[in-house]
Amino acid sequence: MICEREINVVEKKLYHKQDIRLNYYEIKNDLQPLVLIHAQGVDAVSFGNVWERLSKRYHIYSVDCYGHGESLHDAARYNIVDISKAVGSFIEDVVKEKVYLLGHSSGGLIAAYIASATELCSCLILEDPPFFSSQGERRKGTFNYIDLSTICHRFINQSESRDFVLYYFSNQYAWNFFPEKSREKVKQKLTGMAAEYRKKHPDKNLKVMFWPKYALSGFQGMNNYDPLFGEAFYNDSFHSAVLHEDILKNIKCRTVFMKAQTNVSEEGILLAALSEEDLGKTAGLIADCKIVRFECGHGIHIEKPKEFVECLLSL
């Protein structure tokens, strides 16, 4: 069913129960509930560009994970079990019915855990989650590990900089994609521009002239990101020793896997969430899994919003 009436406003709310604290955004209507779980580093507003269009078909709930946005910041809780329990409790107490559950990247790992451990999910949508590639020794050969995870690890073990947003921008792996001859000059200039913007607008999302818009989307909400969350992926404590295989084989609901492009660097670094082999293994373990491919990078809802929305409206 597609709702053709005027779209309701986005409401920002807080779910607080005992030691659970989740900030979330809601677009109310009487349609199928859709809970959105964002990737690490950004916040729930990462999905803001598709909220309105999705609300024609769904009652939208977009949640800040622990360590992000205005949800609980407690490093001891930055793991798949605690976050999944919190979101599960939110669904039980706030939504109060079975949901369509969508998770992007690390949010996809969380969504999958909820679907495997509870009866709260009637349809699971996985937006390019890093199954198998982000766990154990495999994680060390991925873009996320050499980029965000390692930068978080270095940031919390230094004392010169307090601005993680600027620290990440100046140390990100993306500089390696610039021509070696001009790399340092360009890096110095753009980092200077970023520093100036941070000085003038410390509470705003980072903007840097000439930096690609889709790349800047990765800084959405980074002001409130706790680098200790990235440390949990650096040392693999995020998974709480729960194997991806055990999560996937217990998912019984209908599942859609949104797969972005797969790229590998000359050095063998996986410049993607997961490999084609990982994808095959993932889909093979889920009882009912449909794969939908997108010709874009990891942020499908950012780079291909029209196709992303069309996929969800067709479910």
Protein language model annotation of sequence segments:
Residues 20, 26-73:
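Conserved HGGG/HGGXW glycine-rich cap/lid loop of the alpha/beta-hydrolase fold
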Residues 65-102, 106, 113, 137-138, ...:
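Active-site loop/oxyanion-hole signature of alpha/beta-hydrolase fold enzymes
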Residues 108-119, 124:
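Short glycine-enriched nucleophile-adjacent loop
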Residues 125-183:
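Flexible "cap/lid" loop of the alpha/beta hydrolase fold
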Residues 185-246, 262:
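Hydrophobic, aromatic-rich cap/lid helix
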Residues 247-295:
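Conserved loop-alpha-helix segment in the C-terminal half of the alpha/beta-hydrolase fold
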Residues 293-305:
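Catalytic histidine-centered segment of alpha/beta-hydrolase-like enzymes
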Residues 302-314:
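Post-His helix in hydrolase/transferase enzymes
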